[in-house]
Amino acid sequence: SVIKDAEALAAEAFGAENAFFIVGGTSAAVQGMVMSVCKRGDKIIMPRNVHRSAINALILCGAVPVYVNPQMDHTLGISLGMRVEEVKDAIRRHPDAKAVLVNNPTYYGICSNIREIVRLAHAAGMKVLADEAHGTHFYFGENMPVSAMAAGADLASVSMHKSGGSLTQSSFLLCGPSMNAEHVRQIINLTQTTSGSYLLMVSLDISRKNLALHGKEIFRKVVDLTTYAREE
């Protein structure tokens, strides 16, 4: 189908094994991630500053959170990412957890060391889920923090509508090679309509093509503008 063909192009652009169009916002993508790896009673390690959609996913599937408290920057008054040492400790204390969820980046643009978290989690037999609601540019910009797929994460939710140019409410759910794509698709059908808006899906396809062809140039200009603003 044309949708499947467009999803294949998206997977290629983002360096994923599979990609799914999400028309219920990244909230639906995050819920799809959690519910793809957790069932009732399963533990999932996550930062305390996760998006409410992750909490809603726990309510829906009955999974149990193991919270890692992020550090605070008291000068800026913002929360930071998860420290590797604290994730390692959470894995040690809860070896039966099914997954680790990482914000890549946080709402304020702060990244955890996702490469090391992926290494630790996979060594413990856990999946890594990345909420990349604010990380679309990581896949196409130059000298950016590492994207979840490049770091080896198993699933990632990407808000194309925030910094990728698609219409509000449109998003991608990316899968790594370790995931059963058909299982993920079935879970997605639990969290969003089976009659997706073609306006939203077309906007995802167009924005994907735009970033694949011009992403480096676009985000280079963004970096130049922000650098200029800082210096002024």
Model-derived features: positions:
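Conserved PLP-enzyme active-site core in the AAT-like
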Residues: 13-16, 26-232
